[in-house]
Amino acid sequence: MNELRMPNLVRPNRPLREPASRPLTPSRFPVPSQPDAAYTGSAAGSTGLGSPGPAIMDGSTSFGLVQPAPTAHFCHYCGQQGIFRCKGCKKTPYCSVDCQREDWKAHRHMCKSFDPETVGENMKESPDSDNVREDSLNIQRIYLKDLNATKYTKGAEIQGAVVEFNSPGRFFFLPEDPKVMEALMSITAEXQKXPSSTVGTPYVPCVGEVCSVQFSXDLNWYRGLIQTLAADQKTAHVLYIDYGNAENVPVERIKPLNIATKPYCPCAMECQXAGVVPIVDSWSTECCMTVRQLLGGKTLTIKLVDTLKNGRVHTVDIQLSIGKQLSTFLLEQGYAFAEAAAVGSAPAKKDPSALLEASMENFKRCCEGKDINEWAQPPEPLTLTIGDRFSVVVSHFQSPTDFIVQKVENAGVIQDLQLKLREHCSGVETQQDFRPAPGTVCCAQFSEDKQWYRAQVLAYSTEKSVCVGYIDFGNSEEVDLNHLRPISPALLALPKQAISCILAGVQPVEDSWSEECISTMLRMIANKTVNVEIQSAHKGKALVAIIEGEGYSEINVAELLISANYAAPADSNTLQQTEETTASAEPPASPPVCEPLVWSCVELPSDGQTVVLSTSAVTSPAEFYCCVGPTTDHQVLMELGVQLKQHCQSDSTYFVPKVGEPCCVKFSGDGKWYRAMVKELLGDVVKVNFVDFGHNMIVGKGCLRSITPKLLKLPFQAVRCWLAGVKPAGSEWSSEALLWFQNLVDGAQLLARVVSVSQQGYGVELESGGQSVAAALVSQQFAKPSGNLSKDPVRSPTTKQEDLRGGDQSQALTPASNDTQAVCEDGKSEEEPSEVATFSSAWKTAELPLNETFQPCVAAVINPTLFYLLHPIQNVDQQKLQEVMLELALHCSNYQSSSSVDTRPVPGAACCAQFSVDKIWYRAIILEVGEAEMSVVYADYGNSEKVPVSQILPIPTRLLQLPFKIIRCTLAGNEHFPVEWPPQVQQVFRSELLNVMATVQSFDGSANVLSLALPPERGGRNLAAVIQEMLHVHRKGSPLPDASQTPGSDATEPSCIKLGSTTASPDEPEDAAEPADAVTNTQESTPQEQKEMDQATSVHDLQGPGCCCQSLKKQMDRLEKMVQLLLSLQAEG
């Protein structure tokens, strides 16, 4: 028979819902033998043996403390019970200051000891005043640790009475001791003095605090321990420490304990029976009822065996009136068995075999001729593999080392199982001869929802009561025998859905888990979906890491508990002790020989052959990654992915990454494992390059695994290339050039020919759609021909690579740690674009939904062809933004300028800018370039300012992955717009943007194309038409230069119009949308304007500075005639 698992007896949960048991609630702790049950709340159904309240003692108690009947005082104004008195005469009662204020007109004539200053001040007092609030915040709180400890010694015999009984494992005993009686009366009298007013803001206690609490039965004040506080902070569960009973109390009836009150120890001693533990994890109802009758209303003598929990919990044995000790009685009646620990020591853990033996005795008493259900053995557990990661919900929680989860993906399976169980049990009648043996599986009816679930019989607490564990949810309860039904073989086919887990990497700070740790972890994982990753197995449970959130917002629960000092890092040797002990018994073997790691890259033919390539990662024409063929080795990569998963799931060893060495990396996007090369170590994270695809990524060290030589046999599929024969038209590749190049090569089959080879990759000539990519870049004026194109014959990348092709794989290159450079390793060259921060114009803007109409919030304007709006829909992920800000600050503080790289930015490029107010670095977009200062708009907030050139730095590509709050836009109809914009037209465009409505027409690959409509009060016209009219008027007065005009001409320069305050903080985007009046001329055209020049040339076919479209002339002529007609009509009128 399988080993019997005895979890705490709590009710099961419905499928995929919150646990039925909670920390800090009665059912959370099976109080019998656990020392940490002190002051954790009374069990449901507990009753006081003396009285229902702390201050009303039963007359049957023999020590003679009888509380006099309280005198009721009623408010002189409203008639309600009141505890305040007039400060003048000290006689007239009131319930509040408000009632005293209202009654003062009548009462002042009879108030003999009237003091005008005293009463006047009293009338002005209000609980809502700032002084009262400040005093309540500065109150000195008192906790249990501040009270004196009980001074009874071990072996002492104490006479008294049990005043509150929950179970033999938890009851409260009040000693018949004159000192205790004196302390109790002193505490009660002190608590009734000058209680705080109930009007105004109530005092909010904290969990674990000892307060003065007004008892609901007699409305007197007593010392109470705050055990739990409701989420809305309106009620608290309170344990009256001097009497042992508990209740839920509104916070209005709780006030801080007077610090002048003497710190007496709790008068009621919390006790548990010594030397015995229950048959199962909690005491049966029958046992509690029997013992309660033996203890209630009697004077008893207890013997103190031990003191636990910092002197708060006492292990005792009681001499019963029947002449037996309580422990002896419990053993004889079969309610408990003897504890294995020696007398005087802490209770030991229960032996499952002893539990099973005691249970079997109850089972065998009436099993003759019964159906004991021996065939129904528990189903197999779910198959789990190390490295698996999946979403779960927590169905039952006890502590970080004992909780149950269910897979979210199995929710439908569980629901279907419940329907089948309901149908099965509704057709099966109660069978009197059904008595399933412990360890077998049957159907059990859950007491809360009366539904049927699969359950394993754990034990027989009595002849007719059975403890069952719900195998699909993890929790358990005690049920009557007639609430069980036989199960069918079909219902046992599904594996157990409950997964028993232990949080990996943590251990208690002390001997057991603290309540703060348990409640904190439960708040993090209860009622939500979390991700778990299987790391190992320990004692039949899964060691898991719990990850909350996704991507950059991931939170490791274990790390959070450690950082909050709720847990300590686990000693890895502890969990491996069993395995090491077993291994030590075997004869020592020689250490395995580590096979060196060798790898290679796919090579491109260097003899002038033409090959088909497809891009996998594109940064710029100077750096992109390709794979040979559109689907090269696709099937091989799929098979490799399976092998990588199997390897990483079975490899649980700690991996130390080294720069220049390959490894396995889990990609957060799909959770799959890929081959990668370690590029850079950044503390707790690592920058890697996916060698089969070319992408760079920063991942945590927990996402890395070692790699084997077998997994490196397939050459790395991504080949690093650059476009040969061209170089940027300016100092760097413009944003338009980057976007144009990406759109041309992404997803296309490219014909490539290698013209040069280096350690950094291949220089290639590309053809896309029958045209040369380099020639197209030059014709679009995005690039210019390179003057240093190599004319030498094509050579192979390295001599060592030739050896690789001709020799055996065993002669391949070893990792960089062995002083040998890998063939395809990029190295850490400062010229590598992916490693060097740049003023990149290739940042991708968010796409707005098509045909959506909204009122735009303008962030910055360069011209009608290029302006920036705040995203109308997108919500900024503040956590991810903070992570980017931290990394940005680290980058800027460590940035070192390189003289070999021309870092002069261009308008529209992304950068790092230091805000002038708080001196913090932010992501920004350059609007205007000057010699001493630049105009920027802060990309995550929308405000803009001019900053010195020294406060502008290039930005790494990885910091551009999080989308900006601002979006790049262009006005619809831009194909008819000029290259250079007159300042007057730009000023009109800026002024007309107020209160316009925008409609998204398309996305042209780099910007959102918007149609802007003026408000009805301004005519409701399309803003593009207004701009066209203004351009026409300007052309007639001052013709625009054509595209062939030289850069040195005196043409009107483009203007950069900025909308936004120059002093608003990036943290306050709402205040950053005030338009500025300054219009500053730049000294050179932007790349965007150069592209518009080419477009305008192709559309209009300009032949001279005064030429324009014939259709536009006709439209303007008709407009002039209409204006003349209107003027003539007005003149006649």
Swiss-Prot record:
Alphabetized CDD domains for the sequence: Tudor_TDRD1_rpt1, Tudor_TDRD1_rpt2, Tudor_TDRD1_rpt3
UniProt xrefs under SUPFAM superfamilies: HIT/MYND zinc finger-like, Tudor/PWWP/MBT
InterPro entries with a match to the protein in the record: SNase_OB-fold_sf (IPR035437), Tudor (IPR002999), Tudor_domain_containing (IPR050621), Tudor_TDRD1_rpt1 (IPR047376), Tudor_TDRD1_rpt2 (IPR047377), Tudor_TDRD1_rpt3 (IPR047378), Znf_MYND (IPR002893)
PROSITE patterns associated with the record: TUDOR, ZF_MYND_1, ZF_MYND_2
Keyword list, A-Z: Cytoplasm, Developmental protein, Differentiation, Meiosis, Metal-binding, Repeat, RNA-mediated gene silencing, Zinc, Zinc-finger
Any single biological process term in GO: piRNA processing
Bias-annotated ranges (Polar residues): 808-821, 1079-1088
Region Disordered: start-end pairs: 1-55, 786-836, 1036-1104
Sequence positions that bind Zn(2+) 2: C86, C89, H107, C111
Tissue specificity statement from the Swiss-Prot or TrEMBL entry: Expressed in both the ovary and testis in the adult. Present in migrating primordial germ cells (PGCs) and also in the germ cells in both the gonadal primordia (stage 33), and in the developing ovary and testis.
Taxonomic superkingdom: Eukaryota
GO cellular component: P granule; pi-body
Function of the protein: Plays a central role during spermatogenesis by participating in the repression transposable elements and preventing their mobilization, which is essential for the germline integrity. Acts via the piRNA metabolic process, which mediates the repression of transposable elements during meiosis by forming complexes composed of piRNAs and Piwi proteins and governs the methylation and subsequent repression of transposons. Required for the localization of Piwi proteins to the meiotic nuage.
Family (UniProt): Belongs to the TDRD1 family.
PANTHER family listed in its UniProt record: FI02030P-RELATED (PTHR22948:SF29), TUDOR DOMAIN CONTAINING PROTEIN (PTHR22948)
Subunit structure: Interacts with MAEL. Interacts with PIWIL1, PIWIL2 and PIWIL4 (when methylated on arginine residues).
Protein name (Swiss-Prot/TrEMBL): Tudor domain-containing protein 1
